[in-house]
Amino acid sequence: MENLRFLSVSLQLAARLASLGCRRFVGAGTCFEYEPSPGYLAENCSTGPSSLYAATKLGCYLALEQLSKLMGMEVTWLRFFYLFGPYEDERRLVPSVICSLLKDQEAKVTRGDQIRDFLHVEDMAAAICAVAQSHLTGVVNIGSGQPVTVRDLVSKIGEILDRQKLIKLGALPYSGSEPMSICADNSRLTQNTQWVPRYNLEHGLRHTVEWWQLHLASHPSQEWEGLPGA
């Protein structure tokens, strides 16, 4: 029930800030608040969370909207899509494939037909700063706006490391709750801020591979689980 605790704490924090005269609150949501659908997801698309995590994120935003009306504090809600980069939990897709290949182990994945929107974590941080410095309120998507299949993503990692044969597409089944397509329409972000991503997908993956090479070389026996809350 940690998600419910985070919901309560977040709303208490926002209410306290509003009572102290805070004029704007920027919160972190998730793309999983949306109802999955083919094509690009814009901020006005239907919501339909299918997990407690996503439901509490959406609930937090809806409650913040009402708090905004009551206390006069503007609310900006960032919906993050798929992120990758240094310090990510090794059990997640990009680092798990990279680490398996660096250890000369098979990287077992699904058939990889899922369409995703991946953004390097440094570009995410820059987007947060850009939105914070803008006048945007309401929901803002934080994503690359560039769809890629999981198959192409992991194949690119294999190509970078020259270990394509270790990638085993179709070795894992699809998750029943996994959306097959999720990609951001990030036009609200790009048209209303100065944000321009520094990394394209290949550049970001190469940067991430280099980080993991250094990390595994300096921590050869350590199981990395990322930063707290990652």
Residue positions per predicted region:
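C-terminal substrate-binding subdomain of Rossmann-fold SDR/epimerase-dehydratase oxidoreductases
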Residues: 101-230
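Conserved Rossmann-fold NAD(P)-dependent oxidoreductase catalytic core, especially the SDR/UDP-sugar
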Residues: 11-52
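NAD(P)H-binding glycine-rich loop region in Rossmannoid oxidoreductase-like domains
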Residues: 1-5
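Conserved active-site helix of classical SDR/Rossmann-fold NAD(P)-dependent CH-OH oxidoreductases
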Residues: 10-11, 15, 54, 58-65, ...
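Flexible, glycine-rich beta-alpha linker
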Residues: 34, 51, 76-93
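Active-site Tyr-X1-5-Lys
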Residues: 37, 48-76, 102
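Conserved sequence/active-site signature of Rossmann-fold short-chain dehydrogenase/reductase
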Residues: 31-33, 83-85, 114, 124
